[in-house]
A protein has these predicted regions:
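A short loop-to-beta-strand structural motif that recurs across blades of beta-propeller domains
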Residues: 109-112, 149-151, 211-213, 262, ...
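Beta-rich catalytic cores
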Residues: 84-87, 106, 121, 128-131, ...
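Conserved beta-propeller blade signature
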Residues: 98-102, 141-144, 191-195, 243-247, ...
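Surface loop/turn motifs at the tips and blade-to-blade linkers of beta-strand repeat domains
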Residues: 80-85, 124-128, 169-176, 224-228, ...
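Asp-box/WD-like beta-propeller blade repeats and closely related beta-sheet repeat scaffolds
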Residues: 122, 126, 131, 136-138, ...
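Beta-propeller domain segments
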Residues: 28-73, 181, 198-201, 215-220, ...
Length: 406
């Protein structure tokens, strides 16, 4: 065989090989960025059969709300307090009685709800915000936290029809969407407490994340208070001890029944609550738990249910409810979003004894029917009259729970 013939055959083979590669390249699926809610999701058939992400909430007409389905202990009554509040999430009451309501993905709004002649009037006081879940009210000012920053609206109740330009308080938040929306609260020390969740389902978070921080009300002197926190969307301070208690949402995609979400009790600054090494105080992580021992981290005060999704919580400081509820925690469980069996979507009452031991009882139930959510509680708030408001972002509504006796 002559040399030219050999080279012709080699050249032909190379052309064929490159053509085949081009075909495979053309047929190869394009790589798409994983949505934040699916980060860490296994690619197995079992995981793919889990429930899809719920559709975004839409407001439900007042006469269609599931208030008749709500079940409460004897003597308690539930009623619709406000409706038509798209994506209703966090709640805070102003000095003059205005209830401020935050929202998340769909609305991006802050609402002001006023009681006029027995009816609730809803106004939008801020719009087109980036996941403004975190709100707090203090001395006439409304603080609003997004994943990126914290702003303040001064003298807001006197200017609901013409809200003032927000004042920047702190603009150095990382801006992450995964676990980036906030729940904020001013502690008994007069400082603003702000969480920065883990920017992932499961990872070794940077030093700037997976913590609860506190700062002065002008955004200065930021310091870490809690470490090893994955994603808290609700916390409060004990009325007697002043100590911080917080809910923490544990990792997804390990199993339907593990890990179990936590209620944690902070007794000193700098405590580490386990993430990402230990979950639920008893389970080392299959990936990050090697060489770790759950005994080295603060154990949860209470386990709240697998993927129950604890969100807003408050210690009860009102006078309307029976004495057993004094200083109890009311905690909203949003319910699992990626579990085949729906449950929670309720409000639980948590009782704490003098030694810090906690036990949980059902309080407001009835929002799961035929494995579907009828509503999903997002926050709770004690009103000045002692009644309890419960926001429902699934229906865009707020319920009022009162007690009239047996």
């Amino acid at each position: 065989m002559s040399a030219p013939t050999v080279w012709r055959r080699v050249f032909s083979a190379m052309v064929a090989l490159l053509s085949t590669a081009a075909v495979f390249a053309a047929d190869a699926p394009k790589t798409e960025e994983v949505p934040f809610w699916a980060i860490g999701m296994p690619k197995s058939d079992v995981a793919s059969k889990l429930a899809p992400v719920p559709s975004f909430p839409i407001p439900t007409a007042a006469d269609k709300l599931p208030v008749s389905k709500l079940k409460l202990p004897p003597g308690f009554k539930a009623e619709v307090w406000a409706s038509g509040i798209l994506d209703a999430r966090g709640m805070r009451q102003g000095d003059q009685g205005t209830v401020f309501v935050s929202s998340l993905f769909v609305a991006g709004k802050i609402y002001a709800v006023q009681d006029k002649d027995g009816k609730r009037v809803v106004k939008t006081i801020a719009d087109k915000l980036f996941l403004p879940n975190g709100i707090e009210f203090h001395k006439g000012s409304l603080f609003v936290a997004t994943p990126k920053d914290i702003t303040r609206y001064d003298n807001i109740e006197a200017n609901l029809d013409n809200p003032p330009k927000p004042v920047m308080v702190y603009d150095k938040l990382p801006g992450d969407v995964p676990h980036g929306w906030k729940f904020i609260k001013i502690g008994p020390d007069g400082k603003l407490y702000v969480p920065i969740g883990a920017p992932c389902n499961l990872c070794l978070p940077p030093d700037t994340h997976a913590q609860i921080f506190r700062m002065n009300l002008d955004g200065t002197n930021v310091e870490s208070v809690v470490k090893g926190m994955r994603n808290t969307v609700g916390f409060d301070f004990h009325p007697k001890t002043g100590e911080l208690w917080f809910g923490d949402n544990q990792r997804d995609w390990l199993s339907e029944d593990m890990p179990i979400d936590e209620l944690n009790h902070v007794t000193k600054t700098g405590q580490h609550f386990g993430f990402p090494f230990c979950h639920s105080g008893m389970m080392t992580d299959p990936e990050f738990g090697w060489g770790k021992d759950c005994k080295d981290y603060v154990k949860p005060a209470l386990l709240l249910g697998a993927h129950a999704a604890p969100v807003g919580m408050r210690f009860y400081t009102g006078k309307m409810f029976p004495a057993k509820y004094e200083n109890a925690i009311f905690l909203a469980r949003h319910g699992p979003w990626n579990r085949t069996k729906k449950y929670a979507a309720d409000v639980v009452a948590i009782f704490i004894d003098d030694k810090g031991n906690a036990k949980m009882e059902p309080f407001m139930t009835g929002l799961v029917e035929k494995n579907e959510y009828l509503g999903r509680p997002a926050d709770v708030m004690v009103m000045k009259d002692g009644s309890l408001l419960v926001s429902d972002d699934h229906n865009g509504a707020i319920y009022r729970i009162s007690y009239a006796g047996k």
